[in-house]
Amino acid sequence: MTLDKLRKKYIDFFKSKKHFEIMGKSLVPENDPTVLFNTAGMQPLIPYLLGEVHPSGDMLVNVQKCLRTGDIDEVGDLSHLTFFEMLGNWSLGAYFKEYSVKCSFEFLTSSEYLNIPKDRLYVSVFEGDQEIPRDTETAKVWESLGIPKDRIYYLSKDHNFWGPVGSKGPCGPDTEIYVDTGKIKCSINCNVTCSCGKYFEIWNNVFMQYNKDENGNYMELDRKCVDTGMGLERTIAFLQGKSSVYDTDAFMPIIKRIEFISGKIYGQKEDDDRCIRIISDHIKAACFILADSSGVFPSNLGQGYVLRRLIRRSIRYAKKLGIKSHFLADLVDSVETIYRSFYNELTEKKDFIKKELSTEEEKFFKTLFQGEQEFIKITRNLSSKTIPGDIAFKLYDTYGFPYELTEELAFEYGFDIDKSGFNEYFKKHQKTSKKGGDKVFKGGLADYTYETTKLHTATHLLHKALQLVLGDHVKQKGSNITAERLRFDFVHSKKMTDDEIKKVEDIVNLQIKNSLSVKKSIMELSEAREKGAMALFGEKYDNLVSVYEIDGFSLEVCGGPHVENTNELGTFKIQKEQSSSSGIRRIKAILIDE
């Protein structure tokens, strides 16, 4: 079994079960301010899980690119990944627990698909509490498929209940599926909750059955949904009998190239192996971010900062391997080779990716020089031979200077470092980052409010108004919406004049005053394009798409949600117009209630 074969088998299986294959979305979620990147397969489907009608139907399957940033500093072990793919299938009210479980069981055990013996399967279900009953329904389905009671674990909400995000909203029990790896039990009490590695979690089926209200009451949903997820890389490692995802075809071409560049052999020395794993993970994530349709570049903010950090961390660990020259662009071909059959954007943008990596690599070499100069300046003013932890952390956080390099310089110049002090500051930083990472993983559902919906509609008016004032070359490059404001990035090479800004505001406010209706249609993508519907440049779309028309003014391919009439918006006001990156301008705007 290979990475490509597993991906194809999953898609083909669910298509045979009448699921419609939808395209995976951009790594950067559209109009979701709570997240930097899509971190789970369900995130792009949140509006549909909440009740929006999906243009492709109510039984869906796809592969979603995901990127998690909360554990970047832990990457380097055998399991943590920054970029990964999530296989997922969904029912938006079409079926529920029984059919979901039976599909999962068939895919796992059928000789045509994964061919895992059913006597190696273990499952967990929700044990119930004073608010939600025990999930005997799912357990009985598993029993009917031949899973004995002693291999069905009833676990608490911490293990087998999803949501809600925040204090209220959709939620429900889940069933997790495990495979016995054949390893010896770590103790007499070893079970599926143990982290010893005997039981591998291969799949999770979430049953969105309840709505929790503001008073903490759980009410049965009329439209129950299923959301399942299987990590592609972890599953292929299990199927190939590997102890680590890095030993699979998802990483080995990159690792082989790093071996060639560094002269090190993977598997001979753990310190070197860790460096190789970090570089392999980070270069893959960086390539996918740069290839993404969202147009992210290395910077000191948001997604750009994550990209910059991945690149610079790769360079730091390459230095530990003895690589002293530019090398990142040399790894791009290996990443593209792994994914070319499924992600053609890596092939199409390969030269661009190499150029951006080389540019950022050169910048970091200059940063290292500047960091060393700052180190010398700081140590001249110290009254002792110990560098305080806050100073070492400042070099790391403000100047992007890795701690290990500070340590090397300290040794060279005859200084010690208050490492415990540095670790204290670093842990605070990590805690903050992890909170952000948790928010990224669980976010989305919390922010589909009336205020953000109004601002989303306003971005459509803004997009069209910009084209009318500046020209048809204006194309959306990204947006970010909070309950307070919208941020809209668009293609335009010059700073807007005050007169242009005023004209755009006037056009938008006129459409609001005219009380235009907002209508949704579902049509084939080709038809939408023939009608002149605007779409995100570089984004991949399914054959059937949702198109929102603002009565005679704007027509856009969009997943929603939107208000029903522009008269709901209030007064539109541009607060700031500035450069986002080369050739890209950014507008921040608000709606003022009248």
UniProtKB/Swiss-Prot annotation:
Catalytic reaction(s) noted: tRNA(Ala) + L-alanine + ATP = L-alanyl-tRNA(Ala) + AMP + diphosphate
Record's cofactor remark: Binds 1 zinc ion per subunit.
Cofactor(s) needed by this chain: Zn(2+)
Keyword Transport: no
Domain of life: Bacteria
Subcellular localization: Cytoplasm
Gene Ontology molecular-function annotations: alanine-tRNA ligase activity; aminoacyl-tRNA deacylase activity; ATP binding; tRNA binding; zinc ion binding
Residues reported to bind Zn(2+): H456, H460, C558, H562
PROSITE patterns found in the cross-reference section: AA_TRNA_LIGASE_II_ALA (PS50860)
CC terms in the record's Gene Ontology section: cytosol
Assigned EC number: 6.1.1.7
Database matches in HAMAP family: Ala_tRNA_synth_B (MF_00036_B)
PANTHER family the record matches: ALANINE--TRNA LIGASE, CYTOPLASMIC (PTHR11777:SF9), ALANYL-TRNA SYNTHETASE (PTHR11777)
Function summary: Catalyzes the attachment of alanine to tRNA(Ala) in a two-step reaction: alanine is first activated by ATP to form Ala-AMP and then transferred to the acceptor end of tRNA(Ala). Also edits incorrectly charged Ser-tRNA(Ala) and Gly-tRNA(Ala) via its editing domain.
Domain text: Consists of two domains; the N-terminal catalytic domain (in this organism this is shorter than usual) and the editing domain; the C-terminal C-Ala domain found in most orthologs is missing. The editing domain removes incorrectly charged amino acids.
Name this polypeptide is given: Alanine--tRNA ligase
